[in-house]
């Protein structure tokens, strides 16, 4: 991944995090990594633990950002969430998997779409 794409992705994650905070969610972890992958943001939405995948795009050339979350990616996030819960000892009666699509353009602020329970 190019440095520019990394910078755009990092910017998108910061925007998504601020969006979640503004919406009243409480982030508990950001960019949690293990040998099997990474979870972008983990946050409480009231009593629900939200595992959030952030996808950022500058254009729609390759489709909507959320379209990049494929079946294998969703399965991997489920495994990662179970691992995070086990490692941290966190208890959650409900775990939800969200996708935040961030569209960054040169004109205007980024557009953020938060798909709760995306998969």
From Swiss-Prot:
Gene Ontology MF terms: nucleic acid binding
InterPro entries on file: Restrct_endonuc-II-like, tRNA_endonuc-like_dom_sf, UPF0102_YraN-like
Entry superkingdom: Bacteria
Entry similarity comment: Belongs to the UPF0102 family.
Name of the featured protein: UPF0102 protein Sare_1228
Native source species: Salinispora arenicola (strain CNS-205)
């Amino acid at each position: 991944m190019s440095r520019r794409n990394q910078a755009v992705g990092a910017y998108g994650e910061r925007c998504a995090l601020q969006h979640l905070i503004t919406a009243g969610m409480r982030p508990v972890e950001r960019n949690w990594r293990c040998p099997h992958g990474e979870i972008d943001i983990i946050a409480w939405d009231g009593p629900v633990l939200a595992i959030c995948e952030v996808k950022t795009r500058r254009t729609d050339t390759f489709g909507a950002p959320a379209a990049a979350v494929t079946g294998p990616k969703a399965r991997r996030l489920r495994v990662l969430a179970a691992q995070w819960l086990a490692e941290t000892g966190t208890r959650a009666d409900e775990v939800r998997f969200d996708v935040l699509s961030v569209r960054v353009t040169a004109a205007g602020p980024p557009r953020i779409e938060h798909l709760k329970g995306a998969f």
